[in-house]
Amino acid sequence: GLIFDEAYYWYFAQNLSWGYFDHPPMVAFLVNLGINIFDGELGVRLASPFLYAANVFLLWQLIETDKKYKYTWLFMAFVSSIGLMVAYGFMILPDTALLTFSLLFVWAYKRFLLKKDTISVLVLGFSMAAVMYCKYHGILLIGFVLLSNLALLKNSKFWMATAISLVLYTPHLVWLYQVDFAPLKYHLFDRANSAYRIKFTLDYLVNCIAVAGLCFPLMYFAFYKLPSKDKFDKALKFLGYGVFLFFLF
Protein backbone atom coordinates (compact mmCIF):
# COMPACT_ATOMS: atom_id res chain seq x y z
CA GLY A 1 0.00 0.00 0.00
CA LEU A 2 0.90 3.65 -0.10
CA ILE A 3 3.01 5.07 2.69
CA PHE A 4 1.65 7.98 4.71
CA ASP A 5 3.61 10.60 2.74
CA GLU A 6 2.29 9.32 -0.58
CA ALA A 7 -1.28 9.51 0.70
CA TYR A 8 -0.53 13.07 1.78
CA TYR A 9 0.60 13.99 -1.73
CA TRP A 10 -2.42 12.21 -3.20
CA TYR A 11 -4.50 14.62 -1.16
CA PHE A 12 -2.52 17.52 -2.66
CA ALA A 13 -3.23 16.19 -6.13
CA GLN A 14 -7.00 16.42 -5.64
CA ASN A 15 -6.77 20.21 -5.83
CA LEU A 16 -3.88 21.36 -7.99
CA SER A 17 -2.23 24.61 -7.00
CA TRP A 18 1.02 26.45 -7.66
CA GLY A 19 2.11 25.60 -4.14
CA TYR A 20 1.23 23.89 -0.87
CA PHE A 21 1.88 24.56 2.79
CA ASP A 22 5.16 22.65 3.02
CA HIS A 23 6.08 21.81 -0.60
CA PRO A 24 6.25 23.22 -4.11
CA PRO A 25 3.75 21.59 -6.50
CA MET A 26 5.81 19.13 -8.58
CA VAL A 27 4.86 15.99 -6.64
CA ALA A 28 1.18 16.96 -6.77
CA PHE A 29 1.37 17.51 -10.54
CA LEU A 30 2.95 14.08 -11.06
CA VAL A 31 0.41 12.30 -8.86
CA ASN A 32 -2.45 14.13 -10.57
CA LEU A 33 -1.13 13.05 -13.96
CA GLY A 34 -1.04 9.42 -12.85
CA ILE A 35 -4.46 9.27 -11.21
CA ASN A 36 -6.04 10.73 -14.33
CA ILE A 37 -4.74 7.68 -16.21
CA PHE A 38 -5.11 4.86 -13.66
CA ASP A 39 -6.98 4.43 -10.40
CA GLY A 40 -5.50 3.45 -7.05
CA GLU A 41 -1.85 2.96 -6.17
CA LEU A 42 -0.85 2.42 -9.80
CA GLY A 43 -2.06 5.88 -10.70
CA VAL A 44 -0.45 7.54 -7.69
CA ARG A 45 2.93 5.95 -8.41
CA LEU A 46 2.73 5.91 -12.20
CA ALA A 47 5.42 8.56 -12.75
CA SER A 48 8.00 6.91 -10.49
CA PRO A 49 9.29 4.11 -12.78
CA PHE A 50 9.56 6.52 -15.70
CA LEU A 51 11.58 8.93 -13.58
CA TYR A 52 13.78 6.03 -12.46
CA ALA A 53 14.42 5.10 -16.09
CA ALA A 54 15.37 8.72 -16.76
CA ASN A 55 17.77 8.59 -13.79
CA VAL A 56 19.56 5.56 -15.19
CA PHE A 57 19.75 7.14 -18.65
CA LEU A 58 21.13 10.44 -17.34
CA LEU A 59 23.72 8.70 -15.17
CA TRP A 60 24.82 6.72 -18.23
CA GLN A 61 25.11 9.91 -20.27
CA LEU A 62 27.25 11.53 -17.58
CA ILE A 63 29.93 8.84 -17.99
CA GLU A 64 32.37 10.07 -20.64
CA THR A 65 34.70 7.15 -21.33
CA ASP A 66 33.94 4.64 -24.09
CA LYS A 67 34.99 1.90 -21.68
CA LYS A 68 31.52 2.11 -20.17
CA TYR A 69 30.18 -0.09 -22.98
CA LYS A 70 32.50 -2.86 -21.82
CA TYR A 71 31.26 -2.60 -18.25
CA THR A 72 27.54 -2.12 -18.76
CA TRP A 73 26.87 -4.95 -16.32
CA LEU A 74 28.92 -3.18 -13.65
CA PHE A 75 27.03 0.06 -14.20
CA MET A 76 23.68 -1.69 -13.83
CA ALA A 77 24.86 -3.55 -10.72
CA PHE A 78 26.10 -0.31 -9.20
CA VAL A 79 22.89 1.59 -9.95
CA SER A 80 20.78 -1.29 -8.65
CA SER A 81 22.74 -1.34 -5.39
CA ILE A 82 21.70 2.20 -4.43
CA GLY A 83 18.70 1.32 -2.29
CA LEU A 84 17.17 4.77 -2.05
CA MET A 85 17.39 5.31 -5.79
CA VAL A 86 15.64 1.97 -6.36
CA ALA A 87 12.97 2.90 -3.79
CA TYR A 88 12.28 6.10 -5.70
CA GLY A 89 11.65 3.86 -8.70
CA PHE A 90 8.26 2.97 -7.26
CA MET A 91 7.49 5.47 -4.47
CA ILE A 92 6.27 8.95 -5.40
CA LEU A 93 7.77 11.59 -3.13
CA PRO A 94 9.17 15.10 -3.68
CA ASP A 95 12.65 13.58 -3.71
CA THR A 96 11.65 11.22 -6.51
CA ALA A 97 11.39 14.01 -9.05
CA LEU A 98 14.12 16.03 -7.32
CA LEU A 99 16.62 13.27 -8.05
CA THR A 100 15.66 13.16 -11.72
CA PHE A 101 15.75 16.89 -12.30
CA SER A 102 18.96 17.20 -10.28
CA LEU A 103 20.59 14.74 -12.66
CA LEU A 104 19.15 16.69 -15.60
CA PHE A 105 20.61 19.89 -14.14
CA VAL A 106 24.03 18.26 -13.69
CA TRP A 107 23.90 16.90 -17.25
CA ALA A 108 22.83 20.31 -18.59
CA TYR A 109 25.62 22.05 -16.69
CA LYS A 110 28.17 19.62 -18.10
CA ARG A 111 26.88 20.26 -21.61
CA PHE A 112 26.85 24.01 -20.96
CA LEU A 113 30.55 23.91 -20.07
CA LEU A 114 31.32 22.20 -23.38
CA LYS A 115 29.09 24.24 -25.68
CA LYS A 116 26.93 27.17 -24.75
CA ASP A 117 24.34 26.69 -27.46
CA THR A 118 20.59 27.20 -27.34
CA ILE A 119 19.85 23.65 -26.18
CA SER A 120 22.28 23.96 -23.26
CA VAL A 121 20.79 27.28 -22.18
CA LEU A 122 17.19 26.05 -22.45
CA VAL A 123 17.76 22.76 -20.61
CA LEU A 124 19.84 24.44 -17.92
CA GLY A 125 17.13 27.03 -17.35
CA PHE A 126 14.36 24.44 -17.35
CA SER A 127 16.20 22.12 -14.95
CA MET A 128 16.93 24.93 -12.48
CA ALA A 129 13.22 25.76 -12.34
CA ALA A 130 12.29 22.07 -12.14
CA VAL A 131 14.46 21.31 -9.10
CA MET A 132 12.92 24.29 -7.33
CA TYR A 133 9.43 23.06 -8.21
CA CYS A 134 10.34 19.74 -6.55
CA LYS A 135 11.76 21.00 -3.25
CA TYR A 136 13.15 24.28 -1.97
CA HIS A 137 16.36 22.38 -1.27
CA GLY A 138 16.99 22.64 -5.00
CA ILE A 139 18.55 26.04 -4.32
CA LEU A 140 21.47 24.20 -2.71
CA LEU A 141 22.17 22.35 -5.94
CA ILE A 142 22.20 25.55 -7.96
CA GLY A 143 24.10 27.51 -5.32
CA PHE A 144 26.95 25.04 -4.82
CA VAL A 145 27.47 24.65 -8.57
CA LEU A 146 27.62 28.43 -8.86
CA LEU A 147 30.12 28.64 -5.99
CA SER A 148 32.33 26.11 -7.75
CA ASN A 149 32.55 28.35 -10.82
CA LEU A 150 32.00 32.03 -10.00
CA ALA A 151 33.02 32.91 -13.55
CA LEU A 152 29.44 31.98 -14.47
CA LEU A 153 28.41 35.35 -13.07
CA LYS A 154 30.22 36.99 -15.99
CA ASN A 155 28.65 34.69 -18.58
CA SER A 156 25.68 36.16 -20.45
CA LYS A 157 24.44 32.70 -21.50
CA PHE A 158 24.25 31.63 -17.85
CA TRP A 159 22.17 34.71 -17.10
CA MET A 160 19.90 33.80 -20.01
CA ALA A 161 19.40 30.36 -18.46
CA THR A 162 18.72 32.01 -15.10
CA ALA A 163 16.15 34.31 -16.68
CA ILE A 164 14.40 31.33 -18.27
CA SER A 165 14.28 29.53 -14.92
CA LEU A 166 12.85 32.60 -13.18
CA VAL A 167 10.15 33.01 -15.82
CA LEU A 168 9.18 29.35 -15.41
CA TYR A 169 9.23 29.68 -11.62
CA THR A 170 7.25 32.94 -11.53
CA PRO A 171 3.85 31.26 -10.91
CA HIS A 172 5.17 29.73 -7.69
CA LEU A 173 6.87 32.97 -6.64
CA VAL A 174 3.57 34.80 -7.11
CA TRP A 175 1.80 32.12 -5.07
CA LEU A 176 4.42 32.47 -2.30
CA TYR A 177 3.78 36.20 -2.18
CA GLN A 178 0.03 35.66 -2.02
CA VAL A 179 0.37 33.36 1.02
CA ASP A 180 2.89 35.64 2.73
CA PHE A 181 5.75 33.16 2.16
CA ALA A 182 4.21 30.72 4.66
CA PRO A 183 6.10 27.63 3.33
CA LEU A 184 9.47 29.37 3.65
CA LYS A 185 8.65 30.55 7.17
CA TYR A 186 7.64 27.02 8.08
CA HIS A 187 10.85 25.43 6.79
CA LEU A 188 13.17 28.12 8.15
CA PHE A 189 11.64 28.82 11.55
CA ASP A 190 8.68 26.65 12.53
CA ARG A 191 9.64 23.12 11.50
CA ALA A 192 12.15 22.37 14.28
CA ASN A 193 10.06 21.27 17.24
CA SER A 194 12.70 19.87 19.59
CA ALA A 195 16.09 20.83 20.97
CA TYR A 196 19.22 19.47 19.32
CA ARG A 197 20.34 16.00 20.37
CA ILE A 198 23.48 14.10 19.34
CA LYS A 199 21.15 11.37 18.04
CA PHE A 200 20.15 13.67 15.17
CA THR A 201 23.75 13.87 13.92
CA LEU A 202 24.36 10.14 14.37
CA ASP A 203 21.16 9.29 12.50
CA TYR A 204 22.20 11.63 9.69
CA LEU A 205 25.60 9.95 9.34
CA VAL A 206 23.98 6.51 9.28
CA ASN A 207 21.55 7.71 6.63
CA CYS A 208 24.47 8.95 4.50
CA ILE A 209 25.76 5.38 4.47
CA ALA A 210 22.32 3.89 3.83
CA VAL A 211 21.62 6.22 0.91
CA ALA A 212 24.71 4.95 -0.93
CA GLY A 213 23.66 1.33 -0.45
CA LEU A 214 26.01 -1.63 -0.64
CA CYS A 215 28.57 0.30 -2.65
CA PHE A 216 29.01 3.04 -0.05
CA PRO A 217 32.71 2.22 0.71
CA LEU A 218 33.63 2.37 -2.98
CA MET A 219 31.49 5.43 -3.65
CA TYR A 220 32.83 7.54 -0.81
CA PHE A 221 36.41 6.41 -1.33
CA ALA A 222 36.27 7.36 -5.01
CA PHE A 223 34.66 10.70 -4.19
CA TYR A 224 37.39 11.53 -1.69
CA LYS A 225 40.35 10.09 -3.60
CA LEU A 226 39.78 11.10 -7.21
CA PRO A 227 41.07 14.60 -8.08
CA SER A 228 39.05 17.28 -9.85
CA LYS A 229 40.24 17.36 -13.46
CA ASP A 230 37.99 20.17 -14.68
CA LYS A 231 35.18 22.55 -13.73
CA PHE A 232 32.58 19.81 -13.90
CA ASP A 233 34.47 17.58 -11.47
CA LYS A 234 34.93 20.59 -9.20
CA ALA A 235 31.18 21.19 -9.25
CA LEU A 236 30.53 17.59 -8.21
CA LYS A 237 32.97 18.00 -5.31
CA PHE A 238 31.25 21.20 -4.20
CA LEU A 239 27.87 19.48 -4.40
CA GLY A 240 29.02 16.47 -2.40
CA TYR A 241 30.80 18.32 0.38
CA GLY A 242 28.40 21.26 0.37
CA VAL A 243 25.20 19.26 0.77
CA PHE A 244 26.80 16.95 3.35
CA LEU A 245 28.02 19.82 5.52
CA PHE A 246 24.84 21.87 5.13
CA PHE A 247 22.62 19.13 6.54
CA LEU A 248 25.22 18.07 9.09
CA PHE A 249 25.13 21.47 10.76
Q: Where are the model-predicted features located?
A:
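Membrane-interface transmembrane helices that cradle and orient dolichyl/undecaprenyl
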Residues: 64-69, 105-121, 222-228
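Short helix- or helix-capping micro-motifs
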Residues: 72-83, 128, 132, 146
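Transmembrane-lumen/periplasm boundary regions of multi-pass, lipid-linked membrane glycan transferases
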Residues: 141-233
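Short acidic/glycine- and proline-prone juxtamembrane loop motifs at membrane-interface regions
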Residues: 87-98
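Transmembrane-helix signature of polytopic, membrane-embedded enzymes
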Residues: 59-81, 99-100
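Membrane-interface alpha helices of multi-pass inner-membrane proteins
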Residues: 15, 120-135, 146-147, 164-167, ...
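Specific aromatic-rich, kink-prone transmembrane helix
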Residues: 58, 78, 97-114, 120-128
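Transmembrane-helix motifs of polytopic, lipid-linked glycan transferases
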Residues: 46-68, 104-108
